[in-house]
Amino acid sequence: MRNEYIDHLIVFDLETTGCNPVQDYIIEIGAIKIKDGEIVSKYHQMVNPGIPIPYFITEITGITDDMVSDAPYISEALPSFLDFCDTDYILGHNISFDYRFIKSKCSSLGYTFNKKALDTLTIARKFLKHLPSRSLGPLCEYYGIDLRNAHRAIHDAEATYRLFQCLKKDFMDVDASAFIAKEITWDPPKQEMITSRQKKYLADLIRMHRLVVNEDIETLTKSEASRMIDKILVQVRSGQK
């Protein structure tokens, strides 16, 4: 049994500031494009989250604030990634995590992202139950896949595809249904975006008090904008900037 889309897909991985796709931020996107089983192009983009990167995230990924300070915000970076994803099929390791982040950011910025997905984690859990861990690192070690720079998006994406090839070789003939891409049914909770009145008020506050704001105001939700306004007012009243 052969599924054509197995050899025509986008493999991608994200690094983020946390695990909540609505409240946390993307800081790195790495993707590779597969056609006829070969890597034909790559996509890599650092993303400015607009907030300090948590210390534990820097410890895990090696990504620092300096590395993203001049990077585009997600509102600027997302369109080029969506253009790169020119197929209906995606692949990742624990793909639902990455999918939900992209889906959430697309929703807040007015884009759509509806794909069918293959997940090497799901496949490994089905066929490699004897392994103590089915995380990407241990699976790569099991198959002898070189995973340099783990927890960096582009390297994880490349390793994920090599892992997929190994799993397909070993288990495609055992149960081909495990290699059929499936819909991910998840929609982000609806959030109202920043209002035009809030945008103007924030802009006036920032200009009047000569503040430096390291966030992309255009992508704020209504509640996030309210929190930022309250924070600025508290700082101004206390004499801080």
Mark where each language-model region is.
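Conserved non-catalytic scaffold segment of RNase H-like nuclease domains
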Residues: M1-K115, K129-H151
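Short, glycine/acidic-enriched loop or turn micro-motifs at the edges of active sites
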Residues: T16-G18, T122, A159
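Conserved beta-strand -> loop -> alpha-helix junction used to position metal-binding or nucleic-acid-contacting
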Residues: T112-A124
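Generic alpha-helical structural context detector
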Residues: T122-R125, E141, R162-Q165
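Acidic, divalent-metal-coordinating active-site segment for phosphoryl/phosphodiester hydrolysis
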Residues: R152-Q165
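Acidic two-metal-ion nuclease catalytic site recognized across multiple nuclease folds
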Residues: Q165-K241
